[in-house]
Design a protein with these regions (language model features):
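N-terminal membrane-anchoring alpha-helices
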Residues: 1-14
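A generic structural signal for well-ordered alpha-helical segments
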Residues: 5-6, 68, 95, 127
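Catalytic core of membrane glycerolipid acyltransferases/transacylases, capturing the structured
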Residues: 6-8, 23-81
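Generic preference for hydrophobic
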Residues: 15, 29, 52, 160-162
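Thr-Gly-centered strand-to-loop micro-motif
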Residues: 16, 53-55, 77-78, 106, ...
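Glycine-rich helix-loop-beta junction characteristic of Rossmann-like nucleotide cofactor-binding loops
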Residues: 18-22
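Non-catalytic C-terminal accessory region of glycerolipid acyltransferases
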Residues: 85-199
Length: 199
C-alpha cells in the first residue's frame, strides 16, 4: 500500500544503508517522527518481524486502537511507572524469545523541526533490558513535500538514512543517560548532514 501512496503523492524516496536493519535484528529501531504520513515515508523500511511502541492513549482511537493492540504492538502508560516497567519487562522478553525488532519514535510525538526533541526513556530501558542493539533512523526534512499547517502535499524527494547499530550488550541502567545522549547526538548529526547535502 505504501508503494501505491508514494506513486500517488509523487514522492521519490531513497533509503540509504538499509542493510543495517536486517544485520542488527532483533533491534530497537529509533526513528525520527516527522509527520502523520510517516507510515508512508518509512513504509518501505519497516521489517517483517517487528512491532511498534505506542503510548497507552493510542488504544482509545476508534478502530485503529483495536487494530494496534490486536497486531501485537506494545502500549506503555507513561503516567503509571509500575505499569510502564511491567510493559517494558514483558516486551524485552518478547524481543529475546521471538527475535522481533521494535519500532519506536523516541521523541514521543511528531516534530517537524530540524532539531530533535529530548528523547523519552522507555525505549532505552527496553534496549538495555533486552540487551539488543539500537538502530537510529532519520530522514530529510519534509517541509518541501508536506505542509502540515495547510494540509497540503507536494511531489518531491525524501531521503532516509539508516545509521550503524549502537550495541547495548553488557550495558546497564547506569549507562542509560550516556546511551540516550549518544543516540540522539548521532541522529541529530545525521539529520544536519542530510540538510546540508540538500543545500
Amino acid at each position: 500500500l505504501h508503494w501505491i501512496m508514494r506513486a500517488v503523492l509523487g514522492w521519490r524516496i531513497t533509503i540509504e544503508d538499509r542493510g543495517h536493519v536486517a544485520e542488527s535484528a532483533p533491534a530497537i529501531l529509533m526513528v525520527a517522527h516527522k509527520s502523520n504520513l510517516d507510515i508512508i515515508v518509512y513504509g518501505g523500511l519497516y521489517p517483517k518481524h517487528a512491532v511498534v511502541i505506542g503510548k497507552k492513549e493510542v488504544a482509545k482511537i476508534p478502530v485503529f486502537g483495536w487494530f494496534f493492540r490486536a497486531t501485537g504492538n506494545i502500549l506503555i502508560d507513561r503516567k503509571d511507572l509500575q505499569s510502564a516497567i511491567a510493559s517494558i519487562t514483558a516486551a524485552a522478553a518478547r524481543v529475546r524469545e521471538k527475535r522481533i525488532s521494535v519500532w519506536v519514535f523516541p521523541e514521543g510525538h511528531r516534530n517537524d523541526s530540524p532539531t530533535l526533541l529530548p528523547f523519552k526513556k522507555g525505549a532505552f530501558h527496553l534496549a538495555l533490558a533486552a540487551q539488543v542493539p539500537i538502530v537510529p533512523i532519520v530522514c530529510s526534512q519534509l517541509d518541501g513535500v508536506v505542509d502540515g499547517h495547510r494540509l497540503l502535499i507536494y511531489p518531491g524527494r525524501i531521503r532516509i538514512r539508516v545509521l550503524p547499530a549502537i550495541p547495548t550488550e553488557g550495558l546497564g541502567e547506569a549507562d542509560l543517560e550516556p546511551l540516550m545522549e549518544t543516540v540522539r547526538g548521532r541522529m541529530q548529526a545525521a539529520q544536519d548532514q542530510l540538510a546540508s547535502e540538500a543545500g
